[in-house]
Amino acid sequence: MSPAVADDAGVSSVPLQTTATTPSVNQNWRLLRDESAQLRIADVLQRKEQFRPLAKRSFIFPASPQAVWLQVQLPAQKVPSWLWIFAPRVQYLDYYLVQDGQLVRDQHTGESRPFQERPLPSRSYLFSLPVDGKPMTLYVRMTSNHPLMAWFDPVSYTHLRAHET
């Protein structure tokens, strides 16, 4: 069964297609569809109630001009950790880290931006999380004229080292 995004101002109903192989989520991942693709982080921070829960750490949408926003609240990190996102063919990917209601970090990348702006020289994106004893909320905005597929997960240094080749 696919979760659905409820109908709100600027957000329309759509069944979310998720992958069956992704384990169930223990973080509070939520999604907002911005049909206008015009919302900025300041707008999104005012619309937190319009985000809808995701059952999996992945989604697939057909090609469209809309933007998709992810939101997740994470506890304070005790060890070096990163947000890993695999989103092939995402044209624009914007990452925002908010702590205590303040924007702490933003990074803009994606296939339509210069390759040097990518956190890694691959289709995977890796964003460091602060180890400062404070909980955080992450927001990720994605757009693409291609089908939009994304898999995402917070990962630890140990996890990254275990997957090095």
Question: Where do the PLM segments sit?
Answer:
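Early extracytoplasmic/domain-onset interaction patches
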Residues: 7-128
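Structured loops at beta-to-helix junctions and adjacent beta-edge loops in soluble globular domains
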Residues: 73, 130, 141-143
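Short tyrosine-centred short linear motifs in exposed loops/low-complexity segments
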Residues: 78-80, 133-136
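Extended, hydrophilic extramembrane loops/domains of integral membrane proteins
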Residues: 134-155
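Conserved small/polar residues in nucleotide/adenosyl-binding loops
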Residues: 158-165
